[in-house]
């Protein structure tokens, strides 16, 4: 008996731990004054492995989910009202297009003012050390802080254009984004702060000097006027708390009571991501900010970094298959094995527009019913048709003029590029609308 | 139901099926600073009934979750301390100093291993060396001097656990044994290639080889002399060969990520001349059993669709002709099948004889962006005379399903299973996949 006691105790402890971890039925939230939550970080590598390999397996073993699937009763978003609309206010999303009139001018102003740094010198505070593209943190002559990001050498205008266009679209769709604008400068416009730092090739942070700067600028494409082109992203107000996850809750935020995968705004984001081919929509491309406004401090949730959106993969152009399969897509693998590869992929019919400033995005092979990000997103995995229709409603509200104006934010020097991207976005929007909003069978009240 | 008319693309055709409760009623489109809506208490990830039916699996998964948490912490540290760029930098620095470290075995069946290649700076690549070793104690050292087209080389090989089951296609599985091979080779090689439309290759070489068969070192099977006593006389006897050979090839294969179109034809002739006692470079004992080896290999591929689905036919014939019919080559010089040499379901070295015939038919198709699958069958056999004694009923067959991780440029390796008459065998390789 004495020998068994530790085992029983262990099991009890594990049970308690399990219930506690999964949010036991008796869990109550103490009202508390919001204190600044701690800063968190997501490991890119872990996020990839977790969502590519571990979580898909765990989902297959989730008996509750299987019961729901078999009974045709998927779990609906937890923050919707009786009319199936997002309960407001929300620190994740603001009703804009699709719910309120938003003029083209309002969209272009976005989070504002949309003009990039003020004229004058830019002071480099430090070099960007995360992500796949180089960049600088700078302050303009008015003391406003920006992040400058650049295009890959051989694909001028691609990543910066995508970032500017997509930020505009996502703001109009209601999401919190940074104020992004295409901005050009010369090397003489840049000055180094005495405190400027760079993480060198050895992975060590050290003071940044002019040689470092010129070395980084060597790879930055220039326009015909010799000016460097960048994407100037105004730093968000408040204290950065790190990215949010598309699953679970931020435990130290008393206003975060709904698991993120059960939020309508994040589930419905799928439709907007599909429209804009934002296959890089994942935790690390988000940011929580500890914001103080109107005397109230709270966490506001942002989508950031749209350099891997539309036809851009940040450092290269998108592959034709982007948006058609996950990096490790068990469903596609099973289909391929079942047909011994004889069923063609839809993307195999895609035609590359051969527009380096766009990269690759098309509408002909776009399947609005089966679009997928680069690897599974927990909130997208939980989406129901109601969530998608909510997002599709937003997509539908973008007029051709909205789209044309947003594309113009990319400042593409080749008019064919702007025309192509505009046409593709219009056609992709139409496909989404036809698939999710026009079919009575689809819009019937079923999950 | 939402009705969207064709005009939605021109006007802000916001479908308004239901009124929306906008708590922040201002016309301001800026994000709200109001207290967000929340339910009275935290929403569970799973409903209580879901938690209940998932409880057993949740319990079982706790150690995995713990492992995941540890991995997350470790990987986050790797990221925050920039350890990947540091590693890349270190590898780049060592590469600049001429040192390249790699992972991989020494041919099939030698086990997992690694290799270090060294090209001293300022030698224009004319001096090269490499050392490779595996967990099964295989070793290989190579030193080369000269431009790529004319290379003088020295090679040392130690292969301690080479399988041997007897001579001929009927060798019994129960006669498993092994021998060790210690070999040294010195030579001069000329390699030329020309042509774009019809790429042609020519190689010719001369050299000397010293090889010594030793008792096998494997712990799970008897040494060769215990199972085949007649081989004991050939053990521990250094033998010298004078080698000369020529190989010509025509190669029109193209395609990415794997070669998917074109063909390759290759013919090779080698002479292993008898040396009585010492050679020019190496010391030996007795006279070695000289022989000539001729091999002919052909590959042809045909593909369809954009991400290539490829059919391949590969054939290889090897014909060894001893100078003295009563003195066949030593075990290590015989033709062999099994493992990566062909008939993958059989152990490497499962079949030995003078000659061999192997035909492989493969179909490769994409699974996902970074993976493809090969399904293939090998048909072949060893024989004393491939032209006269090979019989269809002696041909062995194996079937394989191989997963091949790939980049956009090339296959990166393979892992899969082959099965045949004697069972199934898992195969894995890092690199070395066409």
Q: Where are the regions a protein language model picked out?
A:
Chain B
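Outer-membrane beta-barrel initiation region
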Residues: 12-154, 158-163, 201-203, 234-260, ...
């Amino acid at each position: 008996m004495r020998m068994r006691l530790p085992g029983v105790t262990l099991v009890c402890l594990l049970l308690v731990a399990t219930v506690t971890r999964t949010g036991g039925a008796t869990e109550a939230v103490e009202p508390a004054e919001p204190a600044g939550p701690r800063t968190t970080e997501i490991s890119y590598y872990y996020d990839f492995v977790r969502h590519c390999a571990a979580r898909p397996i765990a989902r297959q073993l989730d008996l509750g989910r299987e019961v729901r699937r078999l009974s045709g009763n998927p779990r609906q978003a937890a923050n919707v009202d009786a009319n199936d609309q997002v309960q407001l206010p929300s620190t994740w999303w603001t009703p804009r297009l699709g719910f309120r009139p938003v003029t083209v001018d309002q969209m272009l102003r976005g989070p504002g003012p949309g003009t990039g740094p003020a004229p004058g010198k830019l002071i480099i505070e430090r070099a960007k050390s995360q992500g796949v593209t180089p960049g600088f943190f700078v302050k303009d002559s008015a003391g406003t802080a920006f992040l400058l990001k650049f295009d890959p050498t051989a694909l001028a205008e691609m990543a910066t254009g995508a970032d500017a266009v997509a930020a505009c679209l996502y703001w109009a769709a209601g999401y919190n984004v940074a104020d992004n604008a295409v901005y050009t400068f010369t090397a003489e416009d840049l000055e180094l702060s005495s405190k400027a730092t760079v993480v060198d090739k050895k992975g060590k942070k050290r003071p940044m000097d002019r040689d470092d700067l010129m070395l980084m600028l060597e790879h930055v494409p220039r326009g015909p006027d010799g000016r460097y082109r960048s994407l100037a992203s105004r730093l968000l107000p408040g204290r950065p708390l790190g990215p949010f996850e598309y699953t679970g809750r931020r435990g130290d935020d008393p206003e975060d009571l709904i698991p993120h995968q059960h939020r309508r705004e994040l589930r419905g984001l799928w439709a907007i991501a599909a429209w804009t081919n934002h296959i890089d929509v994942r935790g690390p491309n988000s940011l929580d900010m500890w914001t103080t406004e109107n005397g109230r401090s709270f966490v506001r949730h942002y989508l950031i970094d749209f350099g891997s959106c539309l036809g851009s993969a940040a450092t290269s152009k998108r592959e034709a298959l982007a948006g058609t399969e996950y990096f490790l897509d068990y469903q596609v693998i099973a289909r391929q094995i079942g047909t011994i590869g004889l069923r063609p992929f839809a993307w195999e019919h895609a035609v590359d527009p051969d527009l380096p400033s766009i990269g690759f995005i098309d509408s002909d092979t776009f399947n609005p019913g089966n679009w997928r990000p680069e690897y599974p997103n927990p909130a997208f995995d939980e989406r129901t048709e109601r969530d998608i229709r909510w997002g599709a409603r937003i997509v539908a509200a973008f007029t051709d003029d909205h789209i044309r104006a947003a594309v113009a934010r990319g400042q593409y020097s080749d008019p064919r590029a702007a025309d192509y991207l505009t046409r593709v976005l219009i056609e992709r929007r139409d496909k989404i609308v036809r698939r999710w909003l026009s079919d009575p069978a689809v819009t019937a009240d079923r999950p | 139901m939402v009705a969207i008319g064709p005009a939605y693309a021109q006007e802000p055709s916001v479908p308004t099926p239901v009124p929306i409760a906008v708590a922040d009623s201002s016309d301001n489109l800026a994000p709200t600073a109001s207290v967000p809506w929340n339910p009275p208490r935290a929403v569970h990830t799973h409903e209580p009934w879901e938690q209940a039916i998932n409880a057993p699996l949740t319990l079982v998964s706790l150690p995995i979750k713990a492992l995941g948490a540890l991995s997350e912490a470790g990987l986050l540290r790797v990221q925050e301390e920039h350890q990947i760029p540091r590693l890349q930098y270190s590898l780049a620095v060592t590469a600049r100093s001429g040192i390249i470290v790699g992972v991989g075995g020494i041919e099939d069946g030698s086990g997992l291993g690694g290799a270090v290649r060294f090209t001293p700076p300022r030698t224009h690549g004319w001096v090269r060396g490499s050392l490779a070793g595996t967990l099964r104690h295989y070793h290989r050292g190579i030193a080369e001097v000269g431009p790529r087209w004319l290379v003088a080389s020295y090679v040392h090989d130690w292969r301690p656990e080479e399988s041997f089951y007897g001579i001929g296609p009927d060798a019994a599985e129960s006669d498993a044994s092994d021998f060790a091979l210690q070999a040294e080779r010195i030579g001069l090689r000329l390699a030329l290639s020309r042509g774009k439309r019809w790429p042609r290759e020519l190689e010719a070489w001369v050299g000397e080889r010293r090889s010594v068969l030793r008792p096998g070192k494997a712990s799970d099977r008897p040494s060769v002399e215990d199972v085949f006593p007649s081989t004991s006389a050939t053990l521990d006897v250094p033998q010298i060969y004078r080698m000369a050979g020529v190989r010509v090839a025509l190669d029109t294969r193209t395609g990415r990520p794997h070669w998917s179109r074109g063909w390759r034809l290759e013919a090779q002739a080698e002479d292993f001349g008898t040396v009585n006692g010492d050679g020019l470079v190496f010391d030996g004992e007795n006279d070695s059993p000289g022989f000539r080896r001729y091999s002919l290999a052909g590959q042809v591929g045909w593909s369809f669709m954009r991400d290539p689905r490829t059919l391949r036919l590969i054939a290889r014939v090897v014909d060894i002709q001893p100078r003295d019919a009563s003195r066949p080559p030593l075990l290590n010089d015989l033709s062999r099948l099994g493992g990566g040499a062909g008939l993958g379901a059989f152990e490497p070295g499962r079949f030995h004889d003078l000659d061999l015939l192997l035909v492989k038919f493969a179909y490769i198709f994409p699974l996902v962006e970074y993976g493809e699958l090969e399904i293939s069958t090998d048909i072949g056999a060893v024989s004393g005379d491939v032209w006269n004694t090979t019989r269809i009923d002696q041909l062995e067959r194996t079937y394989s399903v191989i997963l091949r991780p790939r980049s956009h440029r090339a296959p990166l390796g393979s892992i899969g299973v082959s099965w045949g008459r004697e069972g199934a065998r898992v195969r894995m390789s890092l690199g070395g996949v066409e």
